[in-house]
A protein has these predicted regions:
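Bacterial N-terminal signal peptides that target proteins for export
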Residues: 2-25
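Sec/Tat signal peptide C-region and signal peptidase I cleavage site
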Residues: 32-38
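Beta-sheet-dominated interaction scaffolds and their linkers
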Residues: 38-68, 107, 175-191
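Surface-exposed binding patches on compact interaction domains or structured appendages
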Residues: 41, 66-120, 205, 212-215
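Asparagine-centered strand-capping/turn motif at beta-strand->loop junctions
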Residues: 62-66, 122, 194-198
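Intrinsically disordered, low-complexity Pro/Gly/Ser/Thr-rich segments with frequent PxxP/GP/PP motifs
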Residues: 92-127, 216-246
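Terminal connector regions
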Residues: 123-164, 245-290
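Transition segment at domain starts
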Residues: 152-183
Length: 291
C-alpha cells in the first residue's frame, strides 16, 4: 500500500507470512528499495499446538544475521485466509486467540549475530467450545527505513513479518475436499477451489498433472497454502514462471493429490477433474469434481 504526502512517500510493504517459505528475511523488502539494513529472520513461521489442561505454549526465534542492531515491536492480529486474496487482518473473530494470549517481550533489541525469543502462552477458558483459536504474531521495526531517490523524494519503508499461532482445543482436525477447477484465461492460470469443512486449519501442497488425450501437457507442484476451518481457497496451480501455460480451446484432464499435515503423518487426497478451455471470448464455468 502506498501513501504519499507532498514530497514524502510512505510504503507499508505487503505482509509476508510463512506460508510458502521456511524462513523470511526482512531485508528482502528493504533491499528492494535500495536500502542496506539489518537482515532478520523469523522462525518458525507457523506454530500448531493442542491445549493441555487449557494451556498451550510456543516460542518464536528472531535472528539478526547482519552487522547492525535490530529494534522491533511485537504485536498480535486476528486473521483469516480470504478465498482469493489470502491473508486478511480482522478486527476480531470467534476464533481470535488474542483475549487468551500472553507473550513477551513486546519490544526487543537484537544485536548483530544473535537470536532473541518471543515466548507465547495461551490459557483458554474452560467455557470455550472445542475448536481452533488463532492469531498472527508480527515483528515490526521501531523505526522505518528512509531512502531518497534521484529526485529528492523521501520514502519510508515499513516492513513486518508474521508467525501464525494456532491453538486447538479438543479433537479438531481439517477435512479438505476439491470442489472445482477453472481456467483463468486472462491470467493464464489454473484455479483449483479447495474447501475445508473441518474445524482446524490446514496448509496443503498440491502435486498435479494436466493431460489432453493421454498426452501430458504439464506437471507441477504448488507450495503450502493455508485454508481456515469452514473456509475455501482458490489455489493457483501454475504459479511459477516455468509452469506458464498457453492452452488451446478444448477439454483437458487434471489429476493429482492434496497433501497436508506433519511430515510423519501426511494426509493425502487424490482428485481427478475435467478442465474446459473455451474458445473465443466465452467465460468457462468451473468444472466440479467427478462424483
Amino acid at each position: 500500500m502506498l501513501f504519499s504526502n507532498q514530497n514524502v512517500g510512505v510504503i507499508s510493504v505487503p505482509i509476508r507470512t510463512a506460508l510458502h517459505l521456511s524462513s523470511w528475511a526482512l531485508s528482502a523488502a528493504l533491499l528492494w528499495a535500495g536500502a542496506s539494513e539489518a537482515q532478520v529472520s523469523l522462525s518458525p513461521l507457523k506454530i500448531e499446538v493442542k491445549t493441555n489442561r487449557g494451556q498451550a505454549q510456543g516460542v518464536i526465534n528472531i535472528t539478526n544475521t547482519s552487522n547492525e542492531t535490530f529494534r522491533a515491536r511485537v504485536y498480535a492480529e486476528s486473521f483469516t485466509y480470504n478465498r482469493d486474496k489470502g491473508f486478511e487482518s480482522l478486527p476480531s473473530s470467534p476464533s481470535d486467540l488474542r483475549p487468551y494470549l500472553q507473550f513477551s517481550p513486546r519490544e526487543l533489541v537484537v544485536p548483530p549475530g544473535t537470536t532473541r525469543r518471543v515466548r507465547l502462552n495461551a490459557r483458554l477458558a474452560p467455557s470455550l467450545p472445542a475448536g481452533e483459536y488463532r492469531t498472527m504474531i508480527f515483528t515490526e521495526p521501531l523505526k522505518p527505513n528512509t531512502v531518497k531517490n534521484g529526485n529528492g523524494i523521501t520514502t519510508n519503508i515499513i516492513t513486518r513479518v508474521g508467525s501464525a499461532f494456532f491453538v486447538r482445543k479438543g479433537d479438531v482436525r481439517p477435512n479438505l475436499m476439491v470442489d472445482s477447477v477453472r481456467w483463468n484465461a486472462e491470467a493464464k492460470k489454473i484455479q483449483l477451489l479447495v474447501r475445508n469443512s473441518g474445524k482446524a486449519s490446514a496448509y496443503t501442497s498440491i502435486k498435479w498433472t494436466l493431460k489432453q488425450g493421454g498426452t501430458v501437457v504439464k506437471s507441477g507442484e504448488s507450495p503450502d497454502t493455508g485454508i481456515v476451518p469452514d473456509g475455501d481457497r482458490n489455489l493457483i496451480l501454475n504459479q511459477s514462471k516455468k509452469d506458464e501455460l498457453a492452452l488451446s480451446p478444448g477439454t483437458y484432464q487434471l489429476s493429482g493429490e492434496l497433501l497436508w499435515g506433519e511430515d510423519n503423518d501426511k494426509s493425502k487426497l487424490p482428485f481427478k477433474l475435467d478442465l474446459t478451455v473455451p474458445g473465443g471470448n466465452s467465460t468457462p464455468s468451473p468444472t466440479r469434481k467427478r462424483r
